[in-house]
């Protein structure tokens, strides 16, 4: 059986490295490969022009591999890593949505690791490296993965709210939503899906629990929010993690939940040498994440760094939302001019900075001790950085130099 891997990302590399003895050697196609060669394990590294669909039995893409790519168009036996590993997948919980996937997945694993739960998918470990004998897989599941998945399904699907994101990849918001909901049609009567009330009528055999907001979800599961130390925008993530625990174990471990430590790059606060507050929210790559960050600091004047790769999303609603705040904007990235245009139409004061270091320096000229400087860019980072993590690191380095 010949398996072709599309893209040389974390997912496909893990498959190639861990399963080469069982299924390899693999043919790995990537636009960055200009000539045919072998890696140290004997896998072939090929340019996409060399792909012959008649010589391939299975094609597995990296999750973010664009659906319009010629390899996807030619593939006859396309399947996601979820489908590929489904036959050995133990009981699983999939967590998706636009914002909060990572935090909810980490919190749920924190609550359930004592029963043998392991974390993977879009966060942590690729499926190729997960223990198939673990009691439970808790998988952060992206819309990209769901788009390519047609066989696999979880026992519990926890869907956080959906807002516009990755529209240039999916083609439209409706396509994005449909990919998020696609797994419901494969779930059965023994499965459980938790989803926003707006999608409550989506056909499925699974037991549905719909919620309007975090308060409603807490009521549905008998969760006392006063016992949770996390506040918005992380409160919903915490409630969802507890809901998953409640379904599986019929327990609510508040103390264990409250011992969870948040990861960096999400509303990560730091002070400069003048004791002024700066917030690294580099992971906020869409409008709903930025709105949540703004609401957290609504009682302060906000100096917001915004911009990057906007992924084809219309951010007009975000800028209209900003009218409710005492806010000044600092535009960066490839979308600098677009951000300035949004700001002008919304009658918001904005500075043209283009690069992150200039934005930090410009803010430093205006920022007072009782105000907040916020990197919550509403855009992806790949126009100027290798990742959102690098963007956050550079931001903190710039702040520490002040």
UniProtKB/Swiss-Prot annotation:
GO MF terms, alphabetically ordered: ATP binding; UDP-N-acetylmuramoylalanine-D-glutamate ligase activity
The organism's place on the tree of life at top rank: Bacteria
Signal peptide boundaries: none
Subcellular location: Cytoplasm
One Pfam entry name: Mur_ligase_M
Keyword vocabulary terms for this entry: ATP-binding, Cell cycle, Cell division, Cell shape, Cell wall biogenesis/degradation, Cytoplasm, Ligase, Nucleotide-binding, Peptidoglycan synthesis
Reaction(s) this enzyme catalyzes, per UniProt: UDP-N-acetyl-alpha-D-muramoyl-L-alanine + D-glutamate + ATP = UDP-N-acetyl-alpha-D-muramoyl-L-alanyl-D-glutamate + ADP + phosphate + H(+)
Coiled coil residues, start to end: none
GO cellular component: cytoplasm
Regions that span the bilayer: none
Binding site for ATP: 97-103
Stored Gene3D superfamilies: Mur ligase, C-terminal domain, Mur-like, catalytic domain
InterPro entries registered for this protein in UniProt: Mur-like_cat_sf (IPR036565), Mur_ligase_C_dom_sf (IPR036615), Mur_ligase_cen (IPR013221), MurD (IPR005762)
EC number, UniProt record: 6.3.2.9
One example of a Gene Ontology biological process annotation: cell wall organization
Pathway(s) annotated for this protein in UniProt: Cell wall biogenesis; peptidoglycan biosynthesis
Its job: Cell wall formation. Catalyzes the addition of glutamate to the nucleotide precursor UDP-N-acetylmuramoyl-L-alanine (UMA).
PANTHER family hit by this protein: UDP-N-ACETYLMURAMOYLALANINE--D-GLUTAMATE LIGASE (PTHR43692:SF1)
Family, per entry: Belongs to the MurCDEF family.
Protein's UniProt name: UDP-N-acetylmuramoylalanine--D-glutamate ligase
Gene name, Swiss-Prot/TrEMBL: murD
């Amino acid at each position: 059986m010949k398996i072709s891997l599309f893209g040389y990302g974390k997912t496909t590399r893990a498959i190639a490295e861990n399963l080469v003895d069982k299924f390899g050697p693999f043919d790995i196609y990537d636009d960055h490969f200009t000539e045919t060669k072998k890696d140290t394990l004997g896998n072939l590294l090929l340019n996409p022009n060399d792909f012959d669909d008649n010589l391939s039995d299975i094609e597995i893409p990296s999750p973010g591999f664009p659906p319009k790519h010629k390899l996807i168009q030619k593939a006859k036996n396309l399947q996601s890593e979820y489908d590929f590993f489904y036959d050995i997948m133990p009981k699983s919980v999939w967590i998706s949505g636009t914002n909060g996937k990572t935090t909810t997945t980490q919190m749920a694993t924190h609550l359930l690791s004592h029963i043998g739960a392991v974390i993977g998918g879009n966060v942590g470990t690729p499926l190729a490296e997960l223990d198939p004998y673990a009691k439970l897989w808790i998988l952060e599941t992206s819309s990209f993965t769901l788009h390519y998945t047609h066989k696999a399904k979880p026992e519990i699907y926890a869907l956080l709210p959906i807002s516009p994101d990755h529209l240039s990849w999916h083609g439209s918001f409706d396509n994005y939503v449909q990919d998020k909901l696609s797994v419901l049609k494969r779930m059965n009567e023994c499965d459980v899906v938790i989803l926003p009330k707006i999608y409550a009528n989506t056909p499925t055999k699974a037991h549905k629990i719909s919620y309007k907001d975090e308060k409603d979800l807490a009521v549905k599961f008998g969760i006392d929010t006063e016992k949770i130390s996390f506040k918005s925008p992380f409160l919903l993530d915490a409630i969802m993690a507890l809901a998953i625990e409640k379904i599986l174990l019929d327990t609510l471990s508040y103390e264990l939940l409250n011992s969870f430590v948040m990861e960096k790059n999400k509303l990560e606060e730091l002070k400069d040498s003048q004791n002024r507050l700066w917030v690294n929210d580099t992971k906020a790559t869409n409008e709903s994440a930025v709105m949540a960050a703004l609401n957290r600091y609504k009682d302060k004047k906000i100096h917001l760094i915004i911009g990057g790769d906007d992924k084809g999303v219309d951010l007009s609603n975000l800028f209209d939302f900003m009218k409710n705040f005492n806010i000044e904007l600092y535009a960066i990235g490839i979308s600098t001019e677009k951000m300035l245009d949004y700001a002008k139409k919304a009658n918001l004061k904005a500075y043209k900075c283009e690069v992150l270091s200039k934005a930090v320096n410009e803010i430093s000229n205006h920022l007072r001790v009782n105000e907040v400087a916020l990197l919550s860019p509403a855009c992806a980072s790949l126009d100027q950085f290798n990742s959102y993590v690098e963007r956050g690191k550079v931001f903190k380095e710039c702040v520490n130099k002040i």
